Amino acid sequence: MSEKQKKRQWHTPAERIMMTGFGVVIILGTLLLCLPVSSASGKGVYWLDALFTATTSVCVTGLVTVPTATTWSVFGKIVILGLIQFGGLGIMACMIMIFLVLRRKISLQSRKLIQDTYNLPVLKGSVGIVRRLLIGTAVVEIAGAICYSFWFVPHYGLWRGIGYSIFHSISAFCNAGIDLVGESSFAPFVTNPLMNVTTMGLMILSGLGFPVWWEVIEHVQDLLKGKRTRKNFIRGFTLHTKLVLTTTVILITGGALLILLLDWNHTGSLGDLKPGEKVMAAFFQSITTRTAGFETIPQKNFTDGSAMVSMILMFIGGSPMGTAGGVKTITVALLIVLVTSYIRGNHDTVVWGRKVVEENIRSAVVIFFFALTTALTATILLVAVSGHPLLDCAYEVVSAVATVGLTRSLTSQLPAAGKIIVILIMYMGRIGPITLAVALGRRTRHVDADIQRPEQRILIG
């Protein structure tokens, strides 16, 4: 293959590894879940339900066709937990973890794959970044499990309580939203501050993304050591961290306020709760729609207005290099900045005195368009094959493509064709935006960049 042909190649090893790696793990997970030992009855589970469960676990979505608590045996639940952890960390992080445990030397090619997978600006320190990611994940998941144990251990006994605490901590942090409580998810905990705060904390942390973690921690350390003052604490953040934190606060607060406004007196959702409980439930709904997919109030019980707000939040999702799905907060933030800059007559896209590179803008536009097109197409197909109401199907599709896992009681009622559609869009939702971001972020893929072509204006609007 000539150098010119290599430059024209779209797919990179990192992209192929991500796509095939997730696919292979889903297949292996399906085979394990099909075994009789994986089911609570000992008779095995229908292959399509096993495939659906493996896909929703690896893609950290949370939609399920069969109740997790009663369908699967202890072995089956361990398999699901392993798939969730793999899906949350990603194939490269898991591979590096194995190398570190076995004390194997990590090759230059593997380091390059890490750089491509996480879209890192430089190759140096890539393994260290993954190591910090793994350590950070372990610390937060252990802390979450300890918090959960204060409720699960007294109610389920020591060993079962510990197991449930670990399962739900990993599920919440990896944004899977799969639970062992029952068919009503976290509805029994709608008024429980401990379970709500713990779950919301895990979901927010994972949704922020690891780069934001590290930068905030470094700034706090500098502040404590006297290297940084309170005045320049926030100013010292990178543009990425500023955008993530600002967008996250606006989405969480704005979403909760809209849900409170729309459902304050609505029977079945917030109307049956006390004022303080309404606020807690609204914030939980606002956070879970962008991340994990646990629910303290059945989604079908919300008004159509709140359902639309939830769909928007699901579509946006979390932040880059986090475990949440969606088009990402940065994508939406850049599009908003692009529009405001255009309205103001600015040639460049500028935010907080910094010019955003054109490459990032193009990536944001393509990722947003890709996700929107996928959601619209899948909604049409799901309505056609299932015959269910448009809102329920659209909610299901957006939840799947954004890997959230919330449903308006539709997943278990889907026909085989509907389940296959949801399986495909869960996979596309987990792989698509990541692959596009990596692909569009590589400068080596500019085709014939040295050729100057004539410009021509076209009519718009």
Identify the meaning behind each predicted range.
Residues M1-G461:
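Membrane-proximal intracellular helices of multi-pass ion channels
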